[in-house]
């Protein structure tokens, strides 16, 4: 996590890109962005996925109401089957139109993260990071949910043998009446 902030942009921005992932979540209002030269009108609950190198800019036209946006900068991560520091949407587009349930979850999470930045308590960074991980998992579930379910879920590598043993026991408890093989 590089940064998180809530902003009400009042002027148009300049074309720019980042060498890290920047997520821009629209809390309210409409946000007009030019991304790689193409215009996108983002609504509340939409997420701009600014992968490294993506050229984008915010534009505010005369008479338009300013949106409220939350910016989150991330680095030093790598999702399986994606380039480092990137979150690739299936259609290759830079904007994710969140479903109603995800929108509700993200609204709550980003508000909680913003509140956490203001309270200045010990462990603040780790709390925000934990919320960010939750946000990323929810995004991945919407983006790749159906496809990954067919592949038995996402791959989360763990070096903790205790975690693996607990998962095996939980699986056996849930499926004790079924035929269980090592292939499962």
Predicted regions: what they are:
Residues 37-52:
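Short acidic-glycine-tyrosine-enriched beta hairpin
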Residues 18, 34, 42, 64-66, ...:
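A generic fold-level signal
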Residues 26-28, 51, 175:
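A short, compositionally biased micro-patch
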Residues 30-32, 39, 55:
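Structural motif
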Residues 1-10, 52-119, 136-151:
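A hydrophobic/aromatic-rich effector-binding and dimerization subdomain
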Residues 94-102, 117-128, 137-174, 178, ...:
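Short, Lys/Arg-enriched, Trp-marked, Pro/Gly-tolerant hinge/linker segments that flank
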Residues 16-33:
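Short, conserved beta-strand element in jelly-roll/cupin
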